[in-house]
């Protein structure tokens, strides 16, 4: 363990199990570190991806690092809450409590710092065909306190995004000791392969869908 870092390395194993350890996220400036490098769902090699998490009294801080990046592929015409997920993004799915959620925040950021943020209504908890599945978009994220600062290091094959998400979105007034379910994802595509994507996840679902909430991992703020 190095200064300001609590290691929480988690290479996805293809299925969530009940005895998965609860990941502890500390107050800033310390952070928990999550890594993944396997595809969804077949667990083949995937570009190394890191997320660093910490919190303060008002905010969840996420630092996304997309490593081994070759393409930096995005649509420059897209704006807030457009379908940036069709290109290259890093994603966080977040809910409070330790039960499998039926509603949760879906946050995405692209290499050109465009964001997508919506509360997802998914009562089947696995996006079952024919079941309700809807999004309530956050239309003015910056005014609401959702911010991102993204930088590209193309010679190093990496892009990084520092994200702040207000805890008030989740009605959390006392964050220390609060319980959460989260999962983190990344999509990879290129001009040559679009619209096909390679998918990666912290805790990989058993099929190519990010919206299976039993695979969200348990987290507690300490």
Curated annotation (Swiss-Prot):
Query: Which Gene Ontology CC terms are recorded?
Result: extracellular region
Main location, first listed in the record: secreted
Alphabetically ordered keywords of this record: Glycoprotein, Secreted, Signal
Does this UniProt record's set of keywords contain RNA-binding?
no
Q: Which residues are glycosylated?
A: 113, 126
Signal peptide annotation: 1-18
The subcellular location is: Secreted
Q: Which domain of life is it from?
A: Eukaryota
* The keyword Disulfide bond is assigned to this record: no
Query: CDD domains annotated for this entry?
Result: CBM9_like_3
Protein name (record): Extracellular protein ARB_03106
According to its UniProt entry, this protein's organism is Arthroderma benhamiae (strain ATCC MYA-4681 / CBS 112371)
Q: Provide the organism lineage as a comma list.
A: Eukaryota, Fungi, Dikarya, Ascomycota, Pezizomycotina
């Amino acid at each position: 363990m190095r200064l300001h870092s609590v290691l929480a390395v988690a290479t996805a194993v293809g299925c969530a199990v009940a005895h998965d350890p609860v990941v502890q996220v500390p107050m800033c400036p310390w952070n928990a570190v999550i890594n993944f490098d396997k595809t969804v769902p077949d667990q083949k090699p995937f570009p190394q991806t890191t997320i660093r998490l910490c919190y303060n009294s008002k905010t969840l801080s996420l630092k996304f690092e997309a490593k081994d990046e070759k393409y930096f592929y995005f649509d420059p015409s897209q704006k807030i809450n457009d379908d940036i997920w069709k290109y290259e993004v890093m994603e966080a799915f977040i809910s409070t409590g330790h039960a499998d959620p039926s509603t949760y925040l879906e946050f995405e950021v692209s290499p050109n710092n465009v964001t997508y943020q919506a509360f997802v209504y998914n009562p089947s908890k696995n996006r079952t065909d024919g079941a309700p599945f809807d999004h309530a978009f956050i239309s003015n994220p910056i005014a609401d306190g959702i911010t991102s600062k993204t930088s590209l290091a193309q010679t190093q094959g990496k892009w990084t995004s520092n994200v702040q998400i207000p805890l008030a979105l989740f009605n959390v007034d006392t964050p220390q000791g609060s319980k959460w379910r989260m999962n983190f994802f990344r999509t990879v595509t290129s001009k040559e392969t679009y619209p096909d994507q390679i998918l990666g996840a912290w805790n990989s679902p058993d099929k190519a869908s990010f919206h299976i909430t039993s695979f969200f991992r348990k987290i507690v703020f300490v």
